[in-house]
Amino acid sequence: MPRYGMIDFDYAGRLANCPPDEDGPVFMVNYMNYRERADYGDGSDGGRSGREADDEYAPVDVLDDIGAVVAYFGDVIDDQTSTGWHRIGIVQYPTRRSFIEMQSRRDFRDKHTHKEAGMDHTIVFGVPVHLVRSASEAGHADRVVFDLVRHERGLGTPAPQQATGPVEGTIMGDGRTWTELRISWLGAGDDLPPLDDVDDRERVVVRTSIDRIRTLVAAADGAHGTPGS
């Protein structure tokens, strides 16, 4: 069992056993918090900080091999919760099953040692790509706001420069349940979006390194014949 979170085995089972005709691309979204120093379990930090251990983990070659794509990656510059998040990462997997099958690959398990050493706690959850609704194409974004929220109403219409998607399950977390991910692309003078309609939330403001979200959502919309805006 990993030290950095609780596995939802019910959701893991749904990912592994999703019928092929119902399966398809899924965003696996990672909220990440690192140890100050890596902990390899033998009293050694490997000469790395927690963040550096996670950099060593980065399984880019494995993702390429299974047809997965890094959809987003960035550093948190304003954490508006008490959780202390450091990074946000999103990977689009071609299917839910491919995410589960990756866990048993030897090359992935070898790299995962570094994630185990570097990660203090994380939330990892799935959002079906074809169900993400995206408003009109955003202009230049100085920062991106990620709001992981829980509420009792249905998925709303995204505001301008925003995308929203339903959370279908949380594979790794702290036991809380989430219903929606909201992503807002903001210019330098834009205010943070309101959050007065939610029961729980994890909000972070992020400086982007990689952002392919809207391109991947548009491709999924085209494949399903359902516009995302």
Regions found by a protein language model. Give the residues of each.
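Short S/T/G/P-rich N-terminal loop/turn motif that feeds into the first structured element of a domain
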Residues: 1-86, 94-101, 120-229
